[in-house]
Amino acid sequence: MANVAIASSVLGLALTIGSCSGGAEPFDRAAMLGSLGQTVILPTYRDFAARAGELETATSTLCGGPSEATLASARDVYAATREVYARAEAFAIGPHTDSPRRLSPKVNFWPVRADLVEEQIAATTSIDLDATSSSARGLPAIGYLLFGLDGGAAEDAAIVAALEGRRCEYLRALTAYQKARADEYVLAWSPDGDDFAGQLAEGRGTFASVQASAGVVFEQLVFTTENVRELKIGKPFGKRDGGVLQLGEQEDRLGGRSLADAHANVRSVQNVWTGRYADVQGIGVRDWLLARRPALEPEVAAAFDAVHAAFDALGDQTLDQAIAEDPEGVEAVYQAVKDLQTVLAVDVAQALAVTVTFNPTDGD
């Protein structure tokens, strides 16, 4: 399933936003949106581009001298790249989902199809990732080549031994492709590119108004928490299939980052909520709430704290390990994210006079 969020049909006036007591809105939503673009969104994508460049370098080093040490280094950079990309989930709109760029299926379509990756490696034609299946060209495909299917020391030795010829050519192509897509995210949001940040702040282009822009930003916070709960934790945990575990339906099972990515998604929500990223404080959705119903803010803060505590209690376990060895802990994460989703979708939405619409990933 692609890591998708809002489709273009939702980005107009697919939601209703009211004003305070029928009067003028006492909060400058355009200033909030402009701040989020410059303080949170663009810096996150710039960091993603930087990490993607480091991943390209690390895999080139790995292919130039395959060893357990260079493999471990490439894996570390892969994890760092996934971490920062996961922290962009709360603004997975516009160029992420919409044509002509529609970057999401090019970067993080999951789960990976190992058989399709192997077909590409076995092929004799030139590598054309634009024409390759989404399930064989994204970050999960890189994870497959770096981690294999089974893990363990024997698998690591086999991975190192196989890193030559077309396999390395494909790995290099994948990481170069991801660096190009990361740069494309930056260009799409930048004033010297598509200026999607400007469209968002000014309520133009894709957006019908500043009201619509602000509503879309808030909706994405709700959708992200719902997707973490339902798709990234709940589905593998058997919450959507009558108790049947769906361990293969993880975002990054092979790289062991499914839990970490889900937690990073929540941190992404919190970054937009607070308007803060990398120690730079801007204006966030929390400020909008403080202008309308400040008494509710501590409840939201407590909900975020509960989610972080539940994730932290699982330590460094993979989702497979946690489900097998600490299902109560996984349940605690699921419930904490559900509580956060509820306070956002019900209490905060009511306070902001925003009607949350249909989540386009619901039912996937």
Describe the function of each predicted region.
Residues 25-364:
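Mature extracytoplasmic or organellar-lumen-exposed domains after removal of signal/transit peptides
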